[in-house]
């Protein structure tokens, strides 16, 4: 068989279709539904991964992207076609790689639902989501894009609501549904503005707008920018449109949470990339300033709110907001460089954002899989009820630790590389003659450094409170390692974190066609893709780093204590005893740090933002000097939820109650409403 994208992509889609069909066929046979639905998904994702890798590797020598027509149509303006250009192949790789790891993981994870939930339904909707997401990043027509975008959103809603018997799950599902459709409405209006300018819905036609002076000078372009920023920004989870994300991700099944955080929100990043750098043309300065400001605010607030969480999956959800902000910082810097006539530096900043996109997909998927393994073993998301899991789940602890190091941007793993590239792109603003760049880029760089430091602190908390010390509940004490396929899915992403961290030059080398497509420049003039990353920016000033060299040095340094042990070990005696307990009779779990206590200094420093509320309940025996129990609770305010969304919700409900009078139950009245609406639309069209 010829292993080309034209052959492998249809095989991937067939795999997802068969996986969906198997889930529905074996609704009453949960073991068969699990095996075949997620088994076919694994095979389909593997074919998709290979197809996208081959497409990226060959795009440098291919003059035209692969185009396939999925279905014939006679509907005007509608084409069911896909185009696998370098941008689609890059995001297709993200979708397929995560889908492969998650499908493997799901083979073991879904066993936890046996006897409780219908695994066939889970597998069917999971495959639909994979297929729709793959088509979203490859669609070549706005109508087709919106169709598969909506299928993706609805299947994700069904999966978020999978455990719908829980009130918090139903509430999160409705919130996601509403926010998703508001975003879809904004995207639809943006496409209508592009249709008005081109007379068609094909992406190739939208691309021609960048060469039309009348479009570049029109107000419609700015309106389209704002609509797309809002629509795709909701899906990506940017502040202040993020409110659905920390609600939906924790309640979804963990394989779905990993896909939503690792992939689904990246479809918003795909949309922003396609629109900003492919459709709308050279940006005005305020576009870049807006995107950079939103990215910076999202990064800082995301990590601050993450530090306040003791729900492990909710903590990871807020970190998704943080990392989306880091991606947008790269995009904002790129737009500003394009406006000031620095296409090479714009390419560097864009690559920083795109590389962080795939890095975040990999390490955040890994972390959610680790959190799912912990939930599978302990049946709780509350870190206060965990502890001591590294001894009981050593493989899961190791995988989670790799993800924690990667997301903390520590060398030599992948998170360090993309954040280093982001720092380098922001530092180039110092050499610019534009005063706005010299003002904003240092501020952005400083806040990015703050974000990285807080992220590292947060994952010291997450790993330490979850996996170290003594168990703080019976569930944690009785935890066990998860099935092999769950570990295998995590292992795939561990390998990806290591590869993207140690060998970034191998991957960056194949992205030249992608940057050529979006900015007209290649990476080669900026980065010497040899034994390390060597940046040669303004006046040849820049930084040099080699993550592979760091890794080799780290391994070499390990041999020093080993050599000392070999030399001196014969002369010393080893004694094994209990952990030092500060002179007390014995350590108990009540003496350990809690997640709430660990983050208290940050809560106090930023109390103007968090507005913490503390509740202390004491019970006494016979005197106020002899307390029998003390209960302490701390709550922080999510400022956007309490100050914006809840008042807005009350306003909408109040208006809805007043408009109920229109629902008279009369067919004649409804026909009059339709007639009046039709007249208004005709008048608008004149």
Residue ranges and their predicted role:
Residues 81-96, 216-232, 436-452, 530-559:
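Hydrophobic alpha-helical transmembrane segments
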């Amino acid at each position: 068989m010829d292993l080309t994208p034209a052959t492998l992509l249809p095989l991937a889609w067939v795999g997802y279709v068969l996986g969906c069909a198997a889930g529905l066929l074996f609704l009453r046979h949960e073991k068969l539904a699990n095996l075949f639905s997620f088994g076919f998904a694994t095979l389909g994702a593997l074919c998709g991964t290979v197809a996208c890798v081959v497409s990226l590797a060959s795009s440098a020598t291919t003059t035209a992207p692969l185009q396939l027509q999925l279905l014939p149509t006679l509907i005007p303006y509608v084409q069911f076609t896909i185009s696998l250009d370098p941008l689609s192949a890059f995001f297709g790789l993200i979708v397929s790689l995560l889908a492969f790891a998650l499908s493997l993981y799901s083979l073991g994870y879904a066993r936890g639902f046996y006897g409780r939930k219908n695994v066939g339904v889970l597998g069917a909707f999971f495959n639909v989501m994979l297929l729709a997401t793959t088509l979203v990043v490859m669609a070549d027509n706005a109508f087709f894009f919106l169709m598969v975008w909506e299928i993706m959103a609805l299947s994700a809603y069904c999966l978020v609501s999978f455990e719908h018997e829980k009130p918090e799950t139903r509430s999160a599902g409705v919130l996601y549904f509403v926010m998703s459709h508001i975003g879809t409405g904004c995207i639809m209006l943006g496409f209508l503005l592009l249709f008005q300018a081109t007379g068609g819905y094909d992406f190739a036609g939208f691309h021609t707008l960048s060469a039309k002076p009348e479009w570049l000078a029109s107000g419609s372009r700015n309106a389209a920018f704002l609509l797309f920023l809002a629509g795709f920004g909701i899906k990506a989870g940017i502040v202040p449109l993020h409110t659905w994300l920390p609600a939906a991700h924790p309640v979804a099944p963990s394989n779905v949470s990993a896909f939503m955080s690792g992939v689904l929100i990246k479809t918003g990043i795909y949309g922003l990339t396609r629109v900003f750098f492919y459709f709308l043309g050279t940006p005005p300065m305020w576009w870049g300033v807006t995107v950079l400001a939103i990215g910076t605010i999202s990064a800082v607030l995301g990590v601050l709110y993450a530090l306040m969480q003791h729900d492990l999956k909710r903590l990871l959800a807020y970190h998704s907001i943080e990392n989306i902000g880091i991606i947008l910082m790269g995009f904002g810097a790129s737009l500003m460089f394009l406006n000031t006539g620095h296409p090479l530096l714009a390419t560097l900043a864009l690559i920083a954002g795109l590389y962080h996109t795939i890095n975040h997909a990999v390490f955040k998927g890994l972390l959610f899989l680790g959190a799912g393994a912990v939930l599978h073993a302990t049946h709780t998301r509350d870190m206060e009820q965990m502890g001591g899991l590294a001894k009981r789940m050593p493989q899961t602890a190791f995988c989670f630790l790799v993800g924690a190091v990667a997301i903390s941007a520590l060398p030599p793993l992948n998170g360090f590389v993309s954040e280093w590239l982001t720092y380098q792109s922001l530092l180039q603003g110092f050499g610019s003659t534009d005063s706005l760049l010299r003002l904003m880029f240092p501020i952005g760089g400083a806040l990015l450094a703050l974000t990285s430091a807080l992220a590292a602190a947060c994952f010291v908390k997450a790993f330490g409170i979850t996996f170290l010390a003594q168990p703080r509940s019976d569930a944690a004490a009785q935890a066990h390692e998860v099935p092999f396929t769950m570990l295998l899915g995590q292992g795939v992403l561990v390998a990806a974190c290591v590869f993207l961290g140690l060998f970034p030059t191998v991957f960056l080398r194949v992205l030249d066609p992608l940057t050529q497509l979006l900015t007209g420049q290649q990476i080669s003039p900026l980065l010497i893709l040899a034994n390390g990353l060597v940046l040669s920016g303004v006046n040849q000033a820049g930084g040099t780093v080699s993550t592979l060299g760091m890794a080799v040095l780290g391994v070499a340094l390990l041999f020093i204590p080993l050599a000392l042990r070999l030399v001196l070990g014969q002369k010393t005696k080893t004694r094994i005893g209990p952990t030092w307990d500060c002179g007390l009779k014995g350590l108990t779990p009540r003496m350990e740090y809690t997640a709430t206590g660990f983050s208290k200094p940050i809560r106090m420093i930023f109390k103007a933002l968090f507005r913490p509320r503390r509740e202390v309940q004491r019970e006494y025996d016979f005197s106020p000097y002899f307390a029998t129990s003390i209960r302490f609770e701390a709550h922080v305010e999510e400022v956007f939820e309490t100050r914006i969304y809840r008042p807005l919700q009350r306003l909408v409900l109040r208006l809805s109650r007043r408009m109920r009078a229109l629902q008279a139950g009369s067919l004649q009245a409804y026909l009059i409403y339709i007639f009046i609406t039709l007249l208004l639309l005709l008048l608008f069209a004149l």
